[in-house]
Curated annotation (Swiss-Prot):
SUPFAM superfamilies hit by this protein: Photosystem II reaction center protein J, PsbJ (SSF161021)
Major location category of this protein: membrane
Lipid bilayer topology: Single-pass membrane protein
InterPro entries: PSII_PsbJ, PSII_PsbJ_sf
Family: Belongs to the PsbJ family.
Cross-referenced Gene3D superfamilies: 6.10.250.2070
Protein name, per record: Photosystem II reaction center protein J
Reported function: One of the components of the core complex of photosystem II (PSII). PSII is a light-driven water:plastoquinone oxidoreductase that uses light energy to abstract electrons from H(2)O, generating O(2) and a proton gradient subsequently used for ATP formation. It consists of a core antenna complex that captures photons, and an electron transfer chain that converts photonic excitation into a charge separation.
């Protein structure tokens, strides 16, 4: 995949961080949207 044979750790951290932020954001957005629509 990569020329050096392994993925740099900072790239893994950035991708993992973005993924966590996206999942948490979607979770809270869905929760607030669900509560707002139910009320």
């Amino acid at each position: 995949m990569f020329a050096e044979g392994r993925i740099p750790l900072w790239i893994v951290g950035v991708i993992a961080g973005m993924g966590v932020i996206a999942v948490v954001g979607l979770f809270f957005y869905g929760a607030y949207a669900g509560l707002g629509s139910s009320m």
